[in-house]
Each structure stands twice: as structure tokens, then as C-alpha cells.
Amino acid sequence: DEGLCGAFNMNLFKRTLEIINQARMAETENPVMFVVYPIGKKASKFAQKLVGDNVDVTADEMTAKSSAEDIARFTGELTREFIAGKVDCVEVVYTHYKSASKQILATRQLLPIAADDLATGEKVERNKPYLFEPDVNTIYNEVLPLYVLSSMQEAICSNRVSEQAARVMAMQSANDNAKELLDELQLEYNKLRQQSITSELLDIIGGKVD
């Protein structure tokens, strides 16, 4: 939504372009169609430049500061689009927060849910078999939408924190550069002042000699 965060926004835009261009290069008979859902003012301005033969942009009121209700509504719309067969895949491009000094560009497949995303890692045989009540399908129908929503919330929150961290780093860098420039100017001023005083002293000495 805002600037003054270094290359944060531009890196997200470049990653989005990379995904679209890679899909275009891999096209066979049927071209891949893209629908971009920008979140934030900066992203919306960028997305409008992508509109073309196989790229469409869907405007939404979503921002990085949207409430939990707005995120749930937005995620529900994407899920319904997927279930209706209007889209084959939903991916989220965001910046994953690692630390205050490290943020990583990430692309996460939201739908369809990859089996690897649901894997727990280590397999423990003693915990098998599981009993599901009332049944597996009912539980999946209840849990999976919550999983998709939590994944979207995590991506938006992580991106928001990364944006603030990038802004702090950018402002700190700008502050350090300003101090360095000020020191250089102060040094140059002192040199010029010293030269001026020396020149005046030489003029005075020269005048007395005359």
C-alpha cells in the first residue's frame, strides 16, 4: 500500500512477471490464462499494466491492513472460483518473513492443496489407524477451508511484517547515508574555511610587508 520500503514492492512485481513469462514460454496449443488479484494500491497499479491477451485483473478492496472478515471473504471468493472450475490453480506471491534483516520472496500454491503441504514429516506407525467421526469426508470439508484460510492469513501477515521490516531497513540505510553525506560536507566546509582563513592571513602578512 505504501512506498519508502526499498525494492520490496518491485521484487514482488518481478516475481509475478517471472511466473507469467515462464508459463507463456511453456505454452503448447492452449495458452495459459491468468487472473491477477492485487492486494494493495501499489500492486493494483502494477497489475493494470499486465492486462493483455491472456492476463486479466480482478479489482478488490483488499489491502494489507484488511480485517480478518475481509480476508475470509476474499479467500472464500477464490475458493468458490476454484471449485466452480473457473480457475485450475491459485498461487499467492508474497514475501516470507524470516527475521528483521532477512525476508524471502515466496510463491505458495493455495489451491489445489498439495499433498506435501499436509504431510507431517516423520511417520509414526504406532499412531495408526485413525478413527474419524463422523467420517473422513465430513472432516475434510470442514478442516480444509480453514486450512486454506489460515494459509492466506499467514501469507498476508508475513508479507505485511516483511514490508515494515524492509521499510525500517530502508529508512535506516537512508539515515546512515544522510549522516555520511553530512560528515563529508562538514569536512569539505572545514577545508574551505581553513583555506579562506589561510588566504586572509597571507593577505594580511603581505600587506604588512608592503
Language-model regions, residue ranges each:
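C-terminal beta-strand-loop-alpha-helix "lid" module of Rossmann-like NAD(P)-dependent dehydrogenases
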Residues: 2-210
